[in-house]
Amino acid sequence: MTATSPAFFSPQEIAAEGLKPEEYAEIVRRLGRHPNKAELGMFGVMWSEHCCYKNSRPLLKQFPTEGPRILVGPGENAGVVDLGDGLQLAFKIESHNHPSAVEPFQGAATGVGGILRDIFTMGARPIALLNSLRFGSLEDAKTQRLFQGVVAGISHYGNCVGVPTVGGEVYFDPAYSGNPLVNVMALGLMETQEIVKSGASGLGNPVLYVGSTTGRDGMGGASFASAELSDQSIDDRPAVQVGDPFLEKSLIEACLEAFKTGAVVAAQDMGAAGITCSTSEMAAKGGVGIELDLDKIPARETGMVPYEYLLSESQERMLFVAHKGREQELIDIFHRWGLQAVVAGTVIAEPIVRILFQGGVAAEIPAEALAENTPLYNRELLAEPPEYARQAWEWTPDSLPACTTAGIEIQGGQQSWNDILLTLLDTPTIASKNWVYRQYDHQVQNNTVILPGGADAAVIRLRPLEEIPNLKSKIPNLKLGVAATVDCNPRYVYLHPYEGAKAVVAEAARNLSCVGAEPLAVTDNLNFGSPEKPIGYWQLAEACRGLAEGCRELATPVTGGNVSLYNETLDSQGIPQPIYPTPVVGMVGLIPDITKICGQGWQASGDVIYLLGLPLASKISLGASEYLATIHNTVAGKPPLVDFDLERRVQKVCREGIRNGWIRSAHDSAEGGVAIALAECCIAGNLGAEINLEIAPMQNRVDEMLFAEGGARILVSVTSAQQAIWESYLQEHLGQQWQILGTVGNFETGLGVFTTDNQILIKVSIEDMSDRYSHAIARRIATNTAVS
């Protein structure tokens, strides 16, 4: 049997599938004939950047992927790490950027559903979700609509499916005005004897289709996700999938039950490219072929043709390879959970994907041509940094107005440091994200140890809901926990992709260390503009180089992730405007004892406040800072350089201090610098602080000391009873890289920052700080709603 070959496709038809003319020529060469419509669509989605990483794959080879705890690295549905005691953690991050731009609710909701399937396809029960979100200015009505829709979609799916959303980050910047980013990370605890892989095997083994029915929703979603957005993208709403979280909940339980029978040889969820991707990837990974009959596929719409079946991205669907003779056992399980389950195909020896329809062959393509031997572009890297970066690096603080202990003159008016602190706390990127968190069910499953916003990373207790075969003890260690975080400062990466990406890894590890967790491994989500433009490719290549170095330096191997390119929006003149390069790092860490962790809020009056890392007298530039962008409307300079030796020592000291019971609170200095970190500790603990700084006017600007970022800095508080042993430990392990800042006060104290000669730099009440910080987002949304 062979597929039929119609006449040539027009250049427009080829381009509509996301293929270049030279790629179409390569398809014809490989097939020895012209493809038919269904085959053209299959190549279009599988050769899209979203599926085959044709521009990024050469760069990803730099990433470290091996380590003593790595059980599954890149190439499977999710990475898996060994937590000890027989426990294994699956985790992964994925993007749903383009769908969320045109249909924010369903785009975000199905992003949650898709990443959950990646987790339970491995044989792991999902235990937590995090998200990393980017939007334009929150003053803009369109941004507010996208923001509210995305948050509603995430909360709807996560809440209904019963998986807690335990943390994340939200940034606002005009660079994302037309192209929001929605990255979702999921964690799962392995429940099966063996990790479920995706490579098909066993000639003659049946191929099962399970889950929901197939419709026309999500048609060509992978190709849609690999193109720039424009005003016409709203017409691509059919490319956005529609999810059913209640059906997914049943699918989770049915799949885990099925895996435990031992009857499943391999499994693959139907995400991007649907049936096309699942059949071709399973066949290619197993070195076999799959023959699938579309007439067996449960359809929710009539009159569907092979092209539609093969490219549909209808949600909550899976493909299994079962042991021959045990298929009915699996079908019965899925029927009991109210789900579809049919034998739709067979594993064959010939390494092809053969699609049958109405008694004929609808498509026949070598599996490797679709899933492994895909196009690869080794693009030329710019010989030197682009002009925008070189100009930005020329910035110096000399261009800023002079400042004193009283404040700084901005646009003809004097602003006190109180004014500037409150302005920064009111900035949506820095402000509390409680407007977001309160819409999420973050305590379902009852294993969330710290509520979102209460610490620098999420902490989840590892309490198996089902018996785990590999447990060394039948009585699980209920003190064992994991921490997780998602991080990226895109302004850093825009201004210096290499140094900025290193800083992303360092901050993620620092956030884990602030709750007492040992960083273990990374999953990354690379969100960039077009790699076909020299600047876009330079940003991508340099960021990958920085991520690779950061992960090697901090011994956090990469277990997999996602690449989302072509994040650009056509402006009114039709010129593509790219987002800031945004390599989001999702990192997980191990907590031996969840009774020994830290939040970021002060714990008791009289505790001593320390700054770990570079002392405030150290010269750190304001370049790339939130202060420079918000207060001076300037995006320039270089991000803080990362000293990995100092990072390792500071983070280890923080973790040991927490485990020994010396440290009572910990919070890293990030956006907004030490002043914002101090304010956040006051707000979280509802306790003030009195800080004394030694100001050397000839050496340091006041704003540099207060608002500069970087320096591997962590604020910790220690009870005075532990002060002597703690300082002895600090002296031994950090030398001079720490200082005492002051003491924790009470609520009435507020935040007071003084010079050693008693000049007041900052004196502001907790009530004022909390009002700005806690209501910044809600206030903007309410104002816009009232106006409209």
From Swiss-Prot:
Single annotated GO MF: ATP binding
Binding site for substrate: S95, H96, N97, H98, R117, Q241, E313, S314, Q315, S564
Subcellular location: Cytoplasm
Domain of life: Bacteria
PANTHER family for the chain: PHOSPHORIBOSYLFORMYLGLYCINAMIDINE SYNTHASE SUBUNIT PURL
Subunit structure: Monomer. Part of the FGAM synthase complex composed of 1 PurL, 1 PurQ and 2 PurS subunits.
Protein family membership: Belongs to the FGAMS family.
Protein name: Phosphoribosylformylglycinamidine synthase subunit PurL
Pathway(s) this gene product operates in, as recorded in its UniProt entry: Purine metabolism; IMP biosynthesis via de novo pathway; 5-amino-1-(5-phospho-D-ribosyl)imidazole from N(2)-formyl-N(1)-(5-phospho-D-ribosyl)glycinamide: step 1/2
Binding site for ATP: Y53, K92, D524, G561
The protein's Enzyme Commission number: 6.3.5.3
HAMAP family: PurL_2
InterPro entries: PRibForGlyAmidine_synth_PurL, PurL_linker, PurM-like_C_dom, PurM-like_C_sf, PurM-like_N, PurM-like_N_sf
Function: Part of the phosphoribosylformylglycinamidine synthase complex involved in the purines biosynthetic pathway. Catalyzes the ATP-dependent conversion of formylglycinamide ribonucleotide (FGAR) and glutamine to yield formylglycinamidine ribonucleotide (FGAM) and glutamate. The FGAM synthase complex is composed of three subunits. PurQ produces an ammonia molecule by converting glutamine to glutamate. PurL transfers the ammonia molecule to FGAR to form FGAM in an ATP-dependent manner.
Reaction equations catalysed: N(2)-formyl-N(1)-(5-phospho-beta-D-ribosyl)glycinamide + L-glutamine + ATP + H2O = 2-formamido-N(1)-(5-O-phospho-beta-D-ribosyl)acetamidine + L-glutamate + ADP + phosphate + H(+)
Keywords, ordered alphabetically: ATP-binding, Cytoplasm, Ligase, Magnesium, Metal-binding, Nucleotide-binding, Purine biosynthesis
Residues bound to Mg(2+) 1: E94, N562
One example of a Gene Ontology biological process annotation: 'de novo' IMP biosynthetic process
Gene3D superfamilies per the UniProt record, alphabetical: PurM-like C-terminal domain (3.90.650.10), PurM-like, N-terminal domain (3.30.1330.10)
Binding positions for Mg(2+) 2 per the UniProt entry: D118, D269
GO cellular component, one term: cytoplasm
Active site per database record: H50, H96 (proton acceptor)
